[in-house]
Amino acid sequence: AMGVKESNIHIEDNRAHDGELSKEKAREIILKYLEEYPDAKVKTVTPFKASGIHEDHRALGEAALELYREGKIKDLRFYVEPYDYKDFKKVNPNVEVWKVLPSQEEKLLSAMNAYKKWNPESGHYAIGYHSVKSHFDELATNKTQYVHAP
C-alpha cells in the first residue's frame, strides 16, 4: 500500500512493547540498520518535548539525534505531529520548523491507509489507527506536515 517493495520491509525481532522503548534500545536498533544502510536518510519524530508526543516515539528521536551528533547519521529530519505543533512551538520556540505540503498526496494517503489495514489473518491489526483515530482523520483533511532539522 505504501509503495515499498516487500523485500525492503523489515520487522524488528528485538522490538519493544508499547510504552517500553528506551533511548538505549532505540539506539541499538537504529545502529543495526545503519550497519546495513550506512547512508540512510533517517526520518523520525522529534526528540524535543511537547505535550502529546508518545514517549516511545520520542525515544527514537533522542537516539537518532545522539547518533547524528556522533556522525553515524548523516541526513536526519524530525517530524512534529500536527496535533502537537502549537504546544511544540510554545515549549521549543527556537527550533525552526517548516511546513511540508505533500507533493504526492496519493503516497501520503496510501501510507495512512497502511495504518488502517485490518486483516488479522495476515498480521495487520490497524493498531496505529485504532490508537489515535482522530489524528489520522485530521491528517486526511489537513495534509500539512511539520519538519525540523537537528
Show where each model-derived region lies:
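Active-site beta-strand->loop->alpha-helix modules in alpha/beta enzyme cores, enriched
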Residues: A1-E70
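The feature marks non-catalytic terminal segments
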Residues: M2-S7, E24-K25, G71-P150
